[in-house]
């Protein structure tokens, strides 16, 4: 076993990586409120796991979406628990994200040289809100349908580009199958991928610059 470790150590410098991860300086002023970002990340990971589990049963069609959600809740093994955890962690993620933004703002964590960390955080906040909008529609019940109709109709007030933008969001002139397909693709592929990329950037900058000092 030692020879195997030495082989990898010689090529990858595993010990140096481990030392960098475990020996990072933590300022003495850090308290429990500095854990809000980490809790948000944990909620995101729970979302990914539970969301992936539900894709085995969910059917993104206007005729079968609601019935598939009902199947998850009433017949699939532990489906009710998985979907409930997904919903609870979604609410928790939004709450923790908001509190995290307030904490960073109130402690001046957005100031030089951490402006880009703040920018990526704002992008992540927008992505989190987008998760809520797209996920809300997926059961395709009355609440989800009318929420999508209202949200996608908002850009219609923009001069010139409003109507084309609405049609782009809906996939057609009215809310229907194309809209659900778009929102499902955004919720399960586009948004998670963008969130993972911006989270990686966010954490790498935090690792590089460290935690901001007290005011």
Curated annotation (Swiss-Prot):
It is found in: Plastid, Chloroplast thylakoid membrane. Heme b 2 binds at residues 86, 187. PANTHER family: CYTOCHROME B. NCBIfam families: PRK03735.1. Heme 1 (or BH or b566) is high-potential and absorbs at about 566 nm, and heme 2 (or BL or b562) is low-potential and absorbs at about 562 nm. Component of the cytochrome b6-f complex, which mediates electron transfer between photosystem II (PSII) and photosystem I (PSI), cyclic electron flow around PSI, and state transitions. This is Cytochrome b6. The lineage of its organism: Eukaryota, Viridiplantae, Streptophyta, Embryophyta, Tracheophyta.
């Amino acid at each position: 076993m030692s020879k195997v470790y030495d082989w990898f150590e010689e090529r990858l410098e595993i010990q140096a990586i481990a030392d960098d991860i475990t020996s990072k300086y933590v300022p003495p002023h850090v308290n429990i409120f500095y854990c809000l970002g980490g809790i948000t990340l944990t909620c995101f990971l729970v979302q990914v796991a539970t969301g992936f589990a539900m894709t085995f049963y969910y059917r993104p069609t206007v005729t079968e979406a609601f019935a598939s959600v009902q199947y998850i809740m009433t017949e699939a093994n532990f489906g009710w628990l998985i979907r409930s955890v997904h919903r609870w962690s979604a609410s928790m993620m939004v709450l923790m994200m908001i509190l995290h933004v307030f904490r960073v703002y109130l402690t001046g964590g957005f100031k030089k040289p951490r402006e880009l960390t703040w920018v990526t955080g704002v992008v992540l906040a927008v992505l989190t809100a987008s998760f809520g909008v797209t996920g809300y529609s997926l059961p395709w019940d009355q609440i989800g349908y009318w929420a999508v109709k209202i949200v996608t109709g908002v850009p219609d007030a923009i001069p010139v580009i409003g109507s084309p933008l609405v049609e782009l969001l809906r996939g057609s002139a009215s809310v229907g199958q194309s809209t659900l397909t778009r929102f499902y693709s955004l919720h399960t592929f586009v948004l998670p991928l963008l969130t993972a990329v911006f989270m990686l950037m966010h954490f790498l900058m935090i690792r590089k610059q460290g935690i901001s000092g007290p005011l």
